[in-house]
Curated annotation (Swiss-Prot):
Annotated gene: plsB
Similarity annotation: Belongs to the GPAT/DAPAT family.
Keyword Manganese carried by entry: no
Any GO BP: CDP-diacylglycerol biosynthetic process
Subcellular compartments: Cell inner membrane
A GO cellular component entry from the record: plasma membrane
Protein name from the UniProt record: Glycerol-3-phosphate acyltransferase
InterPro entries (UniProt xref): GPAT/DHAPAT, GPAT/DHAPAT_C, GPAT/DHAPAT_LPLAT, GPAT_PlsB, Plipid/glycerol_acylTrfase
Pathway assigned to this chain's UniProt record: Phospholipid metabolism; CDP-diacylglycerol biosynthesis; CDP-diacylglycerol from sn-glycerol 3-phosphate: step 1/3
Motif stretch (HXXXXD motif): 306-311
NCBIfam families per UniProt: plsB (TIGR03703), PRK04974.1 (NF003441)
Transmembrane feature ranges: none
């Protein structure tokens, strides 16, 4: 570096340190991008800019990366550690050619690779973005533009606090040399590829240009499908075309978002304060996968589970902080009240009625609006369950939005569409007490400003929040596999709804929900709730609780559930202490130590948190219950029983393991129980270790309430094979409700109608009922006997008496 450059850099550092507060994306590029800091590193920046270079330097050093201004020494040659892909325009001219010194550096590096087969220089493309405001539709400006000195000074002053430093995945020059050679033309090609790459980075951070709402409405009104729907509306209601058009305009105004970057930017500060007020921290996992999709030009559809109204804000906040564009969010029309509605709308929410069956004009406009969002490249978010889960379990998916997504693809989108499942978890859900009341029969309170204010008054520290991005589902690939000729149904007019859509959407919905559960986050509270609720008195000594949490942690770590779920890194003791600090347990002390328990009210609320992760323990718990309730089992007997019960658990809890994987998985779980000294395995015979029976009993009881429900339904069928589906559902609910009173079962979902509805659809799939609803008596009786064997005697007796009573009535 020349002395003149060094002096100018020194002069710039002071004002930049005061004006610029950038954010590095990702926050840990060495791990996220698998950067080997022992190999040579060169940074590539889009434009010649000392300000960008110094901003990059600051963040690189903070992140443990080499100083871009330090020389790169290779085989005695001293080279620059950075290149500019394009020159910066001055006030009087614009020079977008690749600087000759950059081409020279690339050429030198490629030549060195030709001489040394072991050399591998890593090029890290890095972009410094000053503000993320999207452009306006019709401006026809490139996504990423160079700035002259005055423009850069203005950007630093106005957007210095909204600066992003994006580090992209490394480009291996060894790979480039082996794939494309080392002559000088490759250096030019490398620079051209980098320029395209930088434009995509900017697009991923800012999103596509935004239209004005009126321009958008005018474009929608010209849609042939909407024009036809307006004509039908006028004809069917016997009104003028002008009045029908006014209705269409009103519907568009009700639905459409009015995205405002300035609101998102200001809201980010408010939400930052809110999360710090509410939570001790946010744990975000697998965001790098989503960033890659955005940068590769995918149309991203986020499909999170729905725990709380906080979900709307949390996911947008996380995406913004991860350097991506907050999505357009499908929100229920119940949230369109003053003042929340207008704020949500400007934050990207578009509103949807709970039902619009039979309203052709509304459904057509909504479908066309959604297709417009996809066509223009805006990311979209909708809650797959349709509403917030009141039980903490994942609800079966509502398929309407998913079907409309597929229909939008049939318009001929020119980009791949990818679903991104998202698991959102909390150590405290603000509405959880309200959910318990609603499950006991209280009417849901309509959302309003007063409800918001009452909620805000309760703000306090709620522990940790979790956002885990699940394994993406590429829809183009999915359709290629499940509807190979789908492209033949592409219709730019949007009138296509082929016969294959319904079955494909139903399968896709199940896969989507399974991927959400695959990305679950176990945490201190969910683990402690699971253990305490498994105890008969909802109480454990502190030592027993710690021991039980240790059992759970070892199972989760040593028998992995999926690739995307997360397990706490803290010790069992630290997790218990953290859960106690959330002030949800009753702590009593006697001469032998602390006893941790749940009062009746908290027992009901804690089922919500247990249900968040019950699927993670479904199989280990089932195996433990078999060992506790049956003597002298062999491994093959356990495998056989698991194979019979698993399909019901899989359907109800959206479990991901395939049936053909079960035998191997059972062996892995048994081996882990052996390593924890809970059981012994001798010549294929399984025996419980009496010294550690409590841990095994608690593990087994987690799934026992689910098995009780199955036992109720199957024994009703055995007693009365002619029962119609509606009668079977009602009688099962009646017996389940009776069990809750007689045996102190506090789970609100225990007699939930939806849970039984899921069970009965699986009865048909597994051949216990035929397509006409006729029962296979022998098969059903055998399964009912197996379920009885897994229940505790007092519960079994209550079910037997209740079934007999209902049959005699």
């Amino acid at each position: 570096m020349s002395s003149g450059q060094s002096f100018s850099h020194s002069l710039l550092k002071l004002p930049l340190s005061a004006l610029v507060k950038g954010t590095a994306i990702p926050s840990n590029p060495i791990d996220d991008h698998h950067i080997d800091i022992n190999k040579p590193i060169v940074y590539a920046l889009p434009f010649r800019s000392a300000v960008d270079l110094l901003t990059l330097q600051k963040h690189a050093l903070e992140l443990g990366l080499p100083d871009p201004l330090s020389p790169l020494e290779i085989h005695g040659k001293s080279l620059k550690r950075y290149v500019f892909i394009a020159s910066r325009p001055t006030l009087v001219q614009s020079d977008n050619d690749v600087p000759s010194d950059s081409i020279a550096l690339f050429s030198d590096l490629l030549a060195l690779h030709a001489e040394d087969s072991e050399l591998d220089v890593q090029v890290i493309p890095a972009t410094v973005l000053w503000g993320r405001k999207p452009g306006k539709e019709g401006n026809n400006k490139p996504y990423l533009q160079a700035m002259n000195g005055l423009q850069k000074a203005k950007a630093v002053i106005t957007a210095g606090r909204d600066c992003l430093v994006r580090f992209s995945p490394v480009v291996s020059l060894r790979y480039m040399a082996q794939s494309h050679g080392t002559d000088s033309s490759i250096a030019h090609k490398l620079a051209r590829v980098a320029r395209i790459h930088f434009s995509r980075q900017k697009l991923a951070a800012s999103g596509p240009d935004l239209p004005s709402r009126q321009v958008l409405f005018a474009r929608l009104m010209k849609s042939p499908a909407i024009e036809q729907a307006i004509e039908e509306e006028a004809k069917n209601k016997n009104i003028s075309m002008e009045k029908a058009r006014k209705e269409a305009q009103d519907i568009m105004d009700e639905i459409a978002a009015d995205f405002s970057y300035s609101l998102v930017k200001q809201g980010d500060r408010l939400l930052g304060w809110l999360w710090n007020k509410l939570y001790q921290g946010l744990n975000i996992n697998n965001a790098a996968t989503v960033r890659r999709l955005a940068q590769d030009g995918h149309e991203i559809v986020y499909v999170p589970c729905h725990r709380s109204h906080m979900d709307y804000l949390l996911l947008s906040y996380v995406l913004y902080h991860e350097g991506m564009v907050p999505p357009h969010i499908a929100a229920g029309i119940n949230l369109n009240f003053f003042p929340a509605g207008p704020i949500f709308r400007r934050g990207g929410a578009f509103f949807i009625r709970r039902s619009f069956k039979g309203n052709r004009l509304y459904s057509t406009i909504f479908r066309e609006y959604l297709a417009e969002l996809f066509a223009k490249g805006y990311s979209v978010e909708y809650f797959s369950e349709g509403g917030r889960s009141r039980t903490g379990r994942l609800l079966p998916a509502k398929t309407g939005m998913l079907a409309m997504t597929i229909q939008a693809m049939l318009r001929g989108l020119n980009r791949p569409v990818t679903l991104v499942p998202v698991y959102i978890g909390y150590e405290h859900v603000m509405e959880v007490a309200t959910y318990a009341k609603e499950l006991r029969g209280k009417r849901k309170e309509k959302e309003n400003a007063g409800l918001v204010l009452r909620t805000l008054r309760k703000l306090r520290n709620f522990g940790l929040g979790y956002v885990n991005f699940g394994e993406p589902i590429p829809l183009n690939q999915y359709l290629n596999e499940h509807a190979p000729e789908w492209t033949k149904d592409i219709d730019p007019m949007g009138a296509s709804r082929p016969q294959w859509i319904n079955p494909v959407v139903n399968q896709l919905a199940n896969k989507m929900m399974t991927h959400i559960n695959d990305a679950a986050a176990a945490n201190a509270l969910t683990l402690c709730a699971t253990a305490l609720l498994a105890s008969r008195q909802r109480a454990l000594s502190k030592d027993s609780l710690i021991h039980q949490i240790e059992c759970y942690l070892q199972l989760l770590k040593n028998v992995p559930y999926s690739k995307t779920y997360t397990v706490p890194s803290e010790s069992a003791e630290a997790l218990v202490e953290h859960a106690i600090s959330l002030d949800k347990f009753v702590i009593e002390t006697d001469t032998m130590g602390d006893i941790i328990s749940l009062d009746r009210n908290q027992s009901i609320l804690m089922t919500y948190y247990r249900n968040n992760i019950i699927h993670l323990f479904a199989l280990p718990s089932l195996i433990a219950q078999m060992i506790i309730r049956q003597e002298n089992l062999t491994v093959s007997q356990i495998q056989q029983q698991v194979a019979e019960i698993y399909p019901f658990l899989k359907a109800e809890l959206f479990l991901s393991h395939k049936e053909e994987e079960l035998d191997e998985l059972v062996v892995k779980v048994l081996n882990e129980l052996v390593s924890q000294d809970l059981i012994s395995l001798k010549e294929d015979k399984v025996a419980k270790n009496q010294a550690n029976t409590l841990t095994l009993v608690l593990l087994g009881r987690t799934i026992s309430e689910t098995l009780q429900r199955y036992s109720i339904a199957f024994n009703l069928l055995v007693s009365n094979p002619e029962l119609a589906k509606a009668d079977l559902e009602q009688k099962s609910q009646d017996i389940a409700q009776r069990l809750t009173r007689l045996h102190g079962i506090n789970a609100p979902e225990y007699f939930d109608k939806g849970v039984f509805a899921s069970l009965f659809s699986t009865l048909k799939q597994q051949g216990y009922l035929d397509s006409d609803g006729n029962c296979d008596g022998e098969k059903t009786a055998q399964f009912a006997t197996l379920l009885y064997a897994l229940l505790y005697p007092e519960v079994k007796l209550t079910i037997e008496e209740s079934v007999f009573q209902l049959k005699s009535a």
